[in-house]
């Protein structure tokens, strides 16, 4: 799996959210909950992924271009996103 990003957005994301796009692979190697990002018309299909990064629940906004995942943003998950992710994991494991 290959990743790409805009370098200026990566630096801005570190300043704003404290997460480096270079760590995106770790999130994609954990169980993820992925849904389409339909908040706006971006002119391309965007996805919202919730997963784990170094013990923290994070949200990754991304798009797929050919065989490459383009990272748009990584941020700490809000409480409702964390709860949704935890429920997804419980369902996957058959606990609910």
Model feature map: region roles:
Residues 1-96:
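Ribonuclease/tRNase effector modules and their secretory precursors
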